[in-house]
């Protein structure tokens, strides 16, 4: 369990054919974020870097729900994918630059 903006969320590893991983068109998803139950569902077969990317993508959805960020579905998916793909690099660069600036300003 984890908390975002005071809301308790959980992560569930589930079967490939779990109802929450089946899209409305019948295709399968590797992850889903359900605001109503405050649950992130992940395909239990995911491993390694892809698991991390899908988890980050779904956590971004959870954060948007928890902070009442209202975007179109297309914008929401774009933001989640941006953070899942490049977020770690952005944070790493931010940390390096911040510490350099902090030392110069001290």
Functional labels for PLM-detected ranges:
Residues 1-50, 66-106:
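Metalloprotease/metallohydrolase-associated module, dominated by Zn2+-dependent proteases
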Residues 53-65:
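Active-site recognition of the HExxH zinc-binding catalytic motif
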């Amino acid at each position: 369990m984890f908390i975002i903006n005071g809301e308790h969320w959980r992560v569930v590893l589930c079967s490939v054919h779990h109802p929450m991983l089946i899209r409305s068109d019948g295709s399968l998803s590797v992850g889903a974020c359900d605001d109503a139950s405050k649950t992130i569902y992940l395909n239990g077969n995911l491993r390694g870097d892809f698991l991390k990317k899908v988890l980050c993508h779904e956590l971004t959805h959870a954060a948007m729900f928890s902070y009442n960020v209202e975007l179109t579905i297309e914008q929401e998916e774009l933001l989640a994918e941006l953070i899942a793909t490049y977020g770690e690099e952005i944070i790493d660069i931010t940390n390096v630059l911040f510490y350099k600036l902090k030392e110069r300003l001290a």
